Each structure stands twice: as structure tokens, then as C-alpha cells.
Curated annotation (Swiss-Prot):
Its main location: cytoplasm. Binds 2 magnesium ions per tetramer. HAMAP family: Phe_tRNA_synth_alpha1. GO terms for molecular function: ATP binding; magnesium ion binding; phenylalanine-tRNA ligase activity; tRNA binding. InterPro entries: aa-tRNA-synth_II, aa-tRNA-synth_II/BPL/LPL, Phe-tRNA-synth_IIc_asu, Phe-tRNA_ligase_II_N, Phe_tRNA_ligase_alpha1_bac, Phenylalanyl-tRNA_Synthase, tRNA-bd_arm. Pfam families: Phe_tRNA-synt_N, tRNA-synt_2d. It is found in: Cytoplasm. Tetramer of two alpha and two beta subunits. This is Phenylalanine--tRNA ligase alpha subunit. Its EC number is 6.1.1.20.
């Protein structure tokens, strides 16, 4: 058996030394050192040998195995070096060839919807403004006519940011939070500008809510127009123009009285159902109408917070959930599908 091991080692040395390709080296590894290789075949009968002879033969077998593993590793290095050299000696790169295009994914339905909303209002003459997502309680609530004891605060379950997380940015007399709407941007925008003002404010907002129609993070687009003599009729005209541009010229709008602390009067805006064209279906609960946004004339207290004289200027504001608009446009039943990163869903857009 010792002679068989030595003969196997000599044969393996010769063949490994002559192997020049990675595939050949791998084939030799399997042949000699694989589970069903020649070395395993020789060692299969060791159990029948006397203990002393078995110990001596085991030492020889381990030595042969270690040597073959080393030779195979060296052969792999030689084969890889030879392959690289052959590649370098081959045809060079033709820099005159046209470049290869990079495959890109499609736009996310929320991104596409928000961009189109902003683009539509830009064509109506609105600028685009933005603000911080970590907001002060004052701008998120108090400046929008929501004092600390206002019951409407309960309508928005809020994520507050603790002092340790916020660090030095926290003011001693203010609590910080993740903004629950993009309306704070309206106040910040007015504080830095004089009328007339016309702007939309897209962005992410956060509320402690999660179900089939709500997520803890979602997107809104707010709009604000301030000037002298602005009327509710102008609000209706602007939103009607947006609806027809976004949903189609056959889409009608309906205004319903509502309540928002930062507008007075306030109205919910409905459109004819995008699924049944107003005839009535399960999507619109047989009413023919779908709610899309809230709106109203800016409350005098909001103007006062922004340093405007409510006796000199008037204005209107509106806000819409981007995911809600996207669900209506693309007929998506479950809001959570937009945030699950399922390629089968996203590639449809």
C-alpha cells in the first residue's frame, strides 16, 4: 500500500506540473483528492492493517496529501497568471467603439406622481419650496393655528424627537418632531418673503399610523397663494385646472365644506371616480366621487404668525397626499405595496 501511495504521488506530480489551464487543474484535484478520488481509494483499506503499520502509512498519506494540495495551489496560480497574460496579449480596447448603455430601472410610482404634480403646478406659475423634515412644534402646530390645547392635534399622531437625538439643535423652549404635514413650509416661506406668493411644497411627512391605507412615512404636496384680493373662486379655478391637467379633461371636481385649523373657510375636494367615470362602483362606494385633497382660504391667525397683516392680504392653501393620488391614477389597492420593494410590482411602472 505504501508503494501505491508513492506511485500515486509521482503520477500526480507529473500531471499537475504539466497542467496549464484552470479547468485541467480542477479536474486533477477532483481525480486525486476528491471524495471518490484515487487517494481516498488507496486509503480505503487502511482499516484492515495492524495499528503500527496503519499509523506509519497514515503519516505517509498525510504527507502526500499536503504535497499535492501545495502543488495544486501553485498550478492554479500559474494557470491564472497565464490566462491574464493571454488576455493582455490579446486585442486591445478599441476606444472608437460606442459605449455600452447602462440598464436603468423605472421611476417609482410615488416619485413619478409627485414630479408630475409639481410640474403641473409649475405650469400654472407656482414656484417650488422645501423645508426641514425635523421641525419645531411651533411651525408644525402653533404657527398654523394649532395651540398646545387644540383638540385637532389629536388628528395627527406625532413622532417626537428627544433631546439626546437632536443634540445642540434643540431649543430650550421648543420641542422637536418629525413634521406631520408640509404646511410648516408655508409659514417659513412667508416669513422670508413679501406678497405676492405662489408656491408648492412637496416632501416627506411622518405620522404614527400603519394600515392598508396609511404608512408611518408618506409624501404630501402643499400649495400656497397669497396676494391682495384673492378669492375662493380663484382657489376653485386653480384646483379645477390641476385636476383636468392631471386626471383628464373629462374629470369634474366637487367642493365639500370641511374643517382645517389653518384655513377658513375650508373644503374637501372630490373628483369623479377614475374607475367608473362617476357612474358608481365599489372603488367610490357607488357615489361616483373620490376625495383627493383638502383646501381653503388661509386663516388670519396663520398670516399673523408669518408677519402678514390679514386685513391687507388674503390667500388660499391646499394639500394632497401623493400616495393617494398615485393609488387613484394607477389603480393600486394597497398603499403598502409602494414601500415593499417588490420588483414584480415596481417594474410595471
Amino acid at each position: 500500500m505504501r508503494d501505491r501511495l508513492l506511485a500515486l504521488a509521482e503520477s500526480a506530480r507529473r500531471e499537475i506540473g504539466g497542467a496549464s489551464e484552470l479547468s485541467a487543474v480542477e479536474a486533477l484535484r477532483v481525480r486525486y483528492l476528491g471524495k471518490k478520488g484515487e487517494l481516498s481509494g488507496v486509503l480505503g483499506g487502511m482499516g484492515k492493517l495492524p495499528p503500527d503499520e496503519r499509523r506509519s502509512l497514515g503519516e505517509v498519506a498525510n504527507s502526500v496529501k499536503a504535497e499535492l494540495e501545495k502543488l495544486l495551489a501553485e498550478a492554479v496560480e500559474r494557470a491564472e497568471a497565464a490566462a491574464l497574460e493571454a488576455q493582455l496579449q490579446g486585442p486591445g480596447l478599441d476606444v472608437t467603439l460606442p459605449g455600452r448603455g447602462v440598464a436603468l430601472g423605472s421611476r417609482h410610482p410615488v416619485s413619478r406622481t409627485m414630479e408630475e404634480i409639481v410640474r403641473t403646478f409649475s405650469r400654472l406659475g407656482f414656484d417650488v419650496a422645501s423645508g426641514p423634515e425635523i421641525e419645531l412644534d411651533y411651525f408644525n402646530f402653533e404657527a398654523l393655528n394649532l395651540p398646545k390645547d387644540h383638540p385637532a392635534r389629536d388628528m395627527q399622531d406625532t413622532f417626537y424627537v428627544d433631546e439626546a437625538t437632536l443634540g445642540h439643535a434643540k431649543k430650550a423652549d421648543s420641542s422637536a418632531l418629525l413634521r406631520t404635514h408640509t404646511s410648516p413650509v408655508q409659514v417659513r416661506y412667508m416669513l422670508n418673503r413679501k406678497p405676492p406668493i405662489r408656491a408648492v411644497m412637496p416632501g416627506r411627512v411622518y405620522r404614527r399610523d400603519s394600515d392598508i391605507t396609511h404608512t408611518p412615512m408618506f409624501h404630501q404636496v402643499e400649495g400656497l397663494l397669497v396676494d391682495k384680493g384673492v378669492t375662493f373662486a380663484e382657489l376653485k379655478g386653480s384646483l379645477a385646472a390641476f385636476v383636468t391637467a392631471f386626471f383628464g379633461s373629462d374629470t369634474r371636481t366637487r367642493f365639500r365644506p370641511s374643517f382645517f385649523p389653518f384655513t377658513e373657510p375650508s373644503a374637501e375636494v372630490d373628483i369623479t371616480c377614475t374607475n367608473c367615470a362617476g357612474k358608481g362602483c365599489r372603488i367610490c362606494k357607488q357615489t361616483g366621487w373620490l376625495e383627493v385633497l383638502g383646501s381653503g382660504m388661509v386663516h388670519p391667525n396663520v398670516f399673523t404668525s408669518a408677519g402678514y397683516d390679514p386685513n391687507e392680504v388674503t390667500g388660499y392653501a391646499f394639500g394632497m397626499g401623493v400616495e393617494r393620488i398615485a393609488m387613484l391614477r394607477y389603480r393600486i389597492d394597497d398603499l403598502r405595496m409602494m414601500f415593499e420593494n417588490d420588483a414584480r410590482f415596481l417594474e410595471q411602472f
